[in-house]
Amino acid sequence: MGNLPPWVIGVLAGLASSTLYAAASGGATPAIVLLYLSPLPIFIAGLGWGSMMALIAGGTGLVLTSLFNGISSGVVYLAVEVAAPLWLMRLALTSRAVGGRGASAAARAARAREAHHRAVAAGEIDGPPDDLPEPEVTWYPPGLLVVWTTAIAASLLLISILSMTVTENGLRGAIMQMINTGIVDTGELGRVLDARGFDISPRAFLAGIASFVPAMAASLWLIMTLANMMVAQLILVRLGRAARPTPSIAELRYPKLFLAIFPASLLFAFLPGEAGFAGASLAAVLFIPYFLLGLATIHAISRRWQARSAALTGFYTALVLLSPLVAVLVGCLGLADAWMGLRERYAPDLEVA
């Protein structure tokens, strides 16, 4: 890719993103995975070649999706797959030189150094390439990137719930209608539940599922958006194109105000009706950052362990095999770290940022 003009990389990234999105729109359940991978090419373009290339990628994907899938599909693609990555990458590429020389100082220095290298290669300037050391800069904190991603996921969730309050039974009723494709009326679901020994009516079972779907969808979007950003960064590091250094998960930290929102949402969960439904759904989404904080605590404290690699391998194996239980325990560890400062106690040499 090094010989391609940057705008071509942006166009190719947009083409790849729109192709993944179109493949996921086919309706097959396994293809849904492609929907969550759709922002990955845009993240690669932005974190490797700058925000303008991400904008070109997003614009290309929007045009192609609108042309082949319709304007409404293009609007959804823009809102869910493009807007958030563009904003998150703009934040991720923000840096400030130590000493106050202004924002994005590292990016400006990198562009100047690259221009100097091109001039030397073209014979416009005599002498070797400029090998001045990188300026000392501070980058946008990873914790704030998680906060912004969580805020976007929570906003999409609340908009979905509020927009359906005028309909009968709200968002849960709409989801029940969508997943009830005759399986209740034909008695098929009832037979399956009876065969498995569940003492619950088919409609009550569907109502329970409908209550979990919004929070599950928002949580999965949050996790996959952060995962796409991380995977894009790892790919770019391997290619030598990463525009910023890779942050350490052990140094993750959130603002105190953000930490207070989770207990507030738990209080709303006890309210009746749609308010309680919104509070419970929001609490589920806001628990994800605490899960990440729990991972940060484990990585920080384990730095002193002699068999750290084996311990982390065993932990992540347990996380995969016993996913829900271990995830909840890790989230509780994150809660304890947020309010009790476990990393400051057991990893005092760690610079938490």
Task: State what each model feature region is.
Residues 272-353:
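Long, positively charged, glycine-interspersed low-complexity recognition regions
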Residues 7-15, 55-59, 74-79, 145-146, ...:
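Hydrophobic alpha-helical transmembrane segments
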Residues 30-90, 333-340:
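Alpha-helical membrane segments and adjacent membrane-interface helices in multi-pass membrane proteins
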Residues 237-296:
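Small-residue-rich helix-loop
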Residues 213-240:
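Transmembrane alpha-helical segments in integral membrane proteins
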Residues 135-143, 204-219, 244-264:
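Membrane-water interface at loop-to-transmembrane-helix junctions
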Residues 100-139, 146-149, 153-210:
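Membrane-interface interhelical loops and short interface/amphipathic helices
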Residues 1-57, 306-320, 325:
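Hydrophobic transmembrane alpha-helices
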